[in-house]
Curated annotation (Swiss-Prot):
Subcellular location field: Plastid, Chloroplast
UniProt xrefs under InterPro entries: Ribosomal_uS4, Ribosomal_uS4_bac-type, Ribosomal_uS4_CS, Ribosomal_uS4_N, S4_RNA-bd, S4_RNA-bd_sf
Stored SMART domains: Ribosomal_S4 (SM01390), S4 (SM00363)
Signal peptide: none
PROSITE patterns assigned: RIBOSOMAL_S4, S4
Listed name of the protein: Small ribosomal subunit protein uS4c-1
Gene Ontology terms describing biological process: ribosomal small subunit biogenesis; translation
UniProt keyword Cytoplasm, yes or no: no
Gene: rps4
Amino acid sequence: MSRYTGPKIRIIRRLGELPALTTKKVKNNYPPGREWSTNEELSEYAIRLQEKQKIRFNYGINEKQLRRYVKKAKKSRGSTGSYLLNLLEMRLDNIVLRAGLAPTIAASRQLVSHKHIEVNNKIVNIPSFQCSIGDTIHVKKSNKSRQLIDLNSRRDTTKFFPKYLEVNKDNMGARVVKTMDKQDVNLTINELLVVEFYSRKG
């Protein structure tokens, strides 16, 4: 399954607020195709599927990527759900977004892919690159890159900076300073249901 490129508002109306997907706000809180809200009770499978889709769309990853992250998280020590979120939060495209350098995950991925971002003073153009504690992420020192980021930074890109990042707005960069906590995740999600979704699918 490839990444979704259709109307983002439809996704938000179906799944709820997804801060990384779009900066647009939803006027209607009912799912697309319905004229009013209902109290329809979702099945356990539907709830697990919904949580899985939240992660996919918010982090801008496809089904194959998410399945791979879950598989890797299951092999880790400690909480599988927490490790899954850590893998997602430490993606370079997500770090760029959470540092306020891009308005959406799609815009962040584009910045990385077009070689505007450096990690530890070296250009990295792989959005899925896993950042670690101590890594420094900066905008490339070129007029084109800096002007592009300056335009992005003037938008409402993020409501708060996660505690695992030390952000330097003036220098257009950030440093990973600690391990992620659940409170750092800018998304209402039950990650255990996502793990359970794939466990039941085998």
